[in-house]
Amino acid sequence: MTIIDYATAGGKNLIMDYLQSLPQKEKAEGYRIRQLIRLDGIDALDALNTRQLKGKLWEIKFYSNRIMYVLYDRDKIYFLHACKKQKNKAERFELDKAIKRAADYGLRIE
């Protein structure tokens, strides 16, 4: 499966930058998750701690981190936003960022 990370207009990969900023143990888990998805595709998502946020917007939770994503089809997944998990629910402004980034790619989450 192809993973498409959200990048700024200047080409800055915000997802990889976030993973790089994590402590070693959490960073390793983030990379392991990426590798599982790349190799096993949609089946890998069943083994991960995922939950639906809104429409087609989902999140992967690991340690105290979230990666929000949209599954485009069986071959593409868009990682839209990564952040620290602050509360039990995804905070509204974090959701809004992911929704805006989905729109930047022309993806509908509804």
Predicted regions and their residues:
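Conserved catalytic cores of phosphodiester-cleaving nucleases, focusing on short active-site segments
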Residues: L80
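Basic, Lys/Arg-enriched alpha-helical interface segments
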Residues: M1-S64, R74-K76, K84-E110
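Short, surface-exposed beta-strand/loop micro-motifs that present aromatic residues
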Residues: I67-V70
